Amino acid sequence: MANTSSAKKATRKIARRTAVNKSRRTQMRGSVRTVEEAIASGDREAALKAMANAEPALMRAAQRNIVHKNAASRKVSRLAHRIAQLGK
């Protein structure tokens, strides 16, 4: 339990930031899931359209330190590679 007023304020602040980050992480995962579902169905056009939404979502999450920038780049790269394989 926080004792000082500054510690209590920090606890409130952390709770607010956690809620915001959780929301952003959920949105990011949803956009990635949409791409993966399109890839699984074999629909290249839908996958490309979903990827156009997922890539900025991943990069924004990395920029805001929700995920590591290398993890976001790796995810984008792997999704793009899987979409490219659909065309072959």
From Swiss-Prot:
NCBIfam families: S20. The lineage of its organism: Bacteria, Pseudomonadati, Pseudomonadota, Alphaproteobacteria, Hyphomicrobiales. One of its GO terms (molecular function) is structural constituent of ribosome. It comes from the Bacteria. This is Small ribosomal subunit protein bS20. It comes from Rhodopseudomonas palustris (strain HaA2). One of its GO terms (biological process) is translation. One of its GO terms (cellular component) is cytosol. Belongs to the bacterial ribosomal protein bS20 family. Residues 1-36 are annotated as: Disordered.
